[in-house]
A protein has these predicted regions:
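Ribokinase/PfkB-type carbohydrate-kinase core domain
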Residues: 1, 12-190
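Acidic-glycine-rich active-site phosphate/pyrophosphate-binding loop
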Residues: 1-7
Length: 190
């Protein structure tokens, strides 16, 4: 039998909150400013993907999902006790998107009719060494190019988006990209 003295956390669920995260939050924030937003992302054919689509549509966002039946929609759960994040549980498939899926994503980017394209890079299958150049090349001429890079906890480099009009690294991402752990924050931003 199991050792009864193993450390085991036990918490009682008082409530459960569900909301979209990642790139969907960026889209909702842009929409909240009054912008017209077209949203494309890689989703699984599952309840979490449907939840994201419904939530974004309810926010007035035009959603153009690329569904991959071979992977789940990314779901991140946190167990929070008295305001402290005690445990994170992620359902995520970080494998690079297949070529047919990547082609569909490239087509969606190329068909953008807005004034800006925002790439939210969380390294969950869309952005990788094989895809970034193809996705960047698909951005229509004249669009403001923004990279909302979130690669501090995963392999990635904001320099992949070096020719963009705006990139949004945090301090850790900037230091990694520049190979600079010693400068103050202001020189990093220059």
């Amino acid at each position: 039998g199991a050792n009864a003295k193993t450390p085991t956390l036990s918490v009682r669920r008082a409530r459960r909150e569900e909301f979209v995260g990642g790139a969907a939050v960026v889209a909702k924030h842009a929409r909240a400013t009054g912008a017209s937003v077209q949203f494309t992302s890689l989703l699984g054919d599952d309840a979490a993907g449907k939840f994201a689509l419904d939530d974004l549509s309810a926010a007035g966002i035009d959603v153009f999902p690329v569904v991959d039946r071979a992977r789940p929609t990314t779901v991140k759960e946190a167990v929070v006790v008295e305001g402290y994040r005690l445990l994170k549980i992620d359902v995520v498939d970080n494998r690079p998107a297949s070529d047919p899926i990547l082609r569909r994503l490239v087509e969606q980017v190329a068909g953008t009719d807005g004034g800006a394209v925002v790439f939210s890079d969380f390294r969950h299958g869309i952005f990788h060494g094989h895809s970034i150049a193809r996705l960047v090349a698909a951005i229509p001429a004249g669009c403001l190019r923004v990279a909302d890079s979130q690669v501090a906890s995963r392999w990635g480099n904001i320099c992949d988006f070096r020719d963009f009009d705006l990139i949004t690294p945090n301090e850790r991402e900037a230091r990694f990209a520049l190979g600079d752990q010693d400068s103050g924050v202001r020189p990093l931003a220059a």
